[in-house]
């Protein structure tokens, strides 16, 4: 997939964040400001570099930092890291991810109000199986 934004939407979300997790932050902010996220499966895009190509196994623990940037809070970060650890069959990912989360827990890349919106949306999705 490729991300496209209306100019007004892009301006309202403040552009793209220069941080780990930017590709999730923009989607949360789009929803926070009341814009819609749409996927056009008929649009054909050729990526010259595969998504995630530069990831190395150790970088997955940086997800804890990304969760801190997005304001997930401890419990959502823990749940997300456990899910990643199970998916990648790597229990160390949970431990290392929590260390990264703890180190960066005060480095929000969104406002407190936006972080609250993100947490509320995530809990709703989890509790309603969406």
Where are the language model's segments positioned?
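Conserved nucleotide-sugar donor-binding
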Residues: 1-14
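Outer-membrane beta-barrel translocator/channel fold
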Residues: 51-55
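Alpha-helix boundary/capping detector
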Residues: 36-37, 56, 104
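A short, conserved alpha-helix in the catalytic core of glycosyltransferases
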Residues: 9-12, 19-49
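Residues that recognize and position ribonucleotide moieties
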Residues: 3, 38, 68
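Non-catalytic, C-terminal membrane-associated alpha-helical segments of glycosyltransferases
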Residues: 59-130
